[in-house]
Amino acid sequence: MKNLKLLPLFLLICALSFACCETDKQPQKVLRHVVLFGFDSTVTANQVKEIEEAFQALPQQIEEIKGYEWGTDCSPEGLQKGLTHCFLVTFHSEKDRDAYLIHPAHQAFGKLINGKLSAITVVDYWTK
């Protein structure tokens, strides 16, 4: 019987615990680094693949990268202006992004793409 009297208290504690956990799940602002590439017409499919794989390897080499995804253009609008590849890199701070920019792995990647792009656009933004 004593346990039954404690049941409402237990349920209240559980409800409050879940409510606290839910507030922790609110999305925090993150810094997105969007990189768009268009490849020079002389670049081979193997070279494009090498660049894709090299970019994919950066999150394993640079701990400041908190998220990464990429894909190729599939828009029917015809507004790509030669850009074919989009890479999205996520950081928790500008300090993390700045560390990524000067990291030796990123610098080596820059050398790999040198002379192989016909277009490049980079945009950074804070999520809202």
Predicted regions, residues:
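Alpha-helix boundary/capping residues
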Residues: 11-14, 55, 72, 104, ...
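Surface-exposed, polar helix/loop patches in the mature regions of secreted/periplasmic/lumenal proteins
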Residues: 86-128
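Sec-dependent bacterial lipoprotein signal peptides
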Residues: 1-17
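Short S/T/G/P-rich N-terminal loop/turn motif that feeds into the first structured element of a domain
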Residues: 6-7, 18-84, 92-99, 125-128
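Intrinsically disordered, low-complexity segments enriched in polar/charged small residues
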Residues: 10, 37-38, 102, 111
